[in-house]
Amino acid sequence: MPPKPIITKQDIINAAIQLVRENGISSVNARNLAKTLNCSTKPLFRIYTNMDEIKEDIKIELDNYYNSFMESKINDENRLLSQGLAYIEFAQNEKMIFNTLFMNMTMKGSSLQDIIHAKWNRITIENAKKVTGLSIEKSEMLFINFWLYSHGVATQIISNGIDIPLDMVQQLLENAFERFSLDITKTE
């Protein structure tokens, strides 16, 4: 009798991410994972206690993937602008993963203050202060305005299937950054 193929934790996560990428997080269940891995559901539950545990690992893996993507795209010349552009590019390239990370209530319970004070965003806000010469409070306001604008563009792309070329996205974001900066400067 040939040995049974061994399914690893990473095999399960890779299969789950493939399912998310193709059909969204709602497609990740034991039956679909087993089908993708070409096995029964037993190997899944030898490694994991339940589907919630699998989904926790999926979230971690997707967060790592997103963070790596963002880090490869962001530059300190204008971190806020490059972050917004990278965010939208990620939405264009990875619609279902973006939807899973940012549209399926993963931000539920977060306040704008939580977002402003997240370590990743503090770096961007400090850079915006340096780039614009605004106070830290005004840089936080610029960050929120720009972040919400970028999120709006990204959600239009994934929700309504609007095809916006990346060069046009860049122009939209540059205009928004300039406009938001000017408006905030007027209130100082």
Protein language model features and the residues they cover:
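Amphipathic C-terminal alpha-helical segment
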Residues: 100, 147-165, 179-188
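Alpha-helical DNA-contacting segments of helix-turn-helix folds
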Residues: 20, 53-62, 69, 98-101, ...
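Basic, helix-initiating cap at the start of DNA-binding domains
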Residues: 1-23, 27, 32, 53-56
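Amphipathic alpha-helical packing segments from all-alpha helical-bundle domains
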Residues: 108-133, 140-144, 171-185
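Amphipathic alpha-helical segments that line or abut small-molecule/effector binding pockets
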Residues: 77-96, 140, 144
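Short secondary-structure transition hinges
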Residues: 89, 93-126, 159, 163-167
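Amphipathic alpha-helical linker/stalk segments
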Residues: 56-83, 120-131
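Short hydrophobic/aromatic patch on the recognition helix
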Residues: 37-48
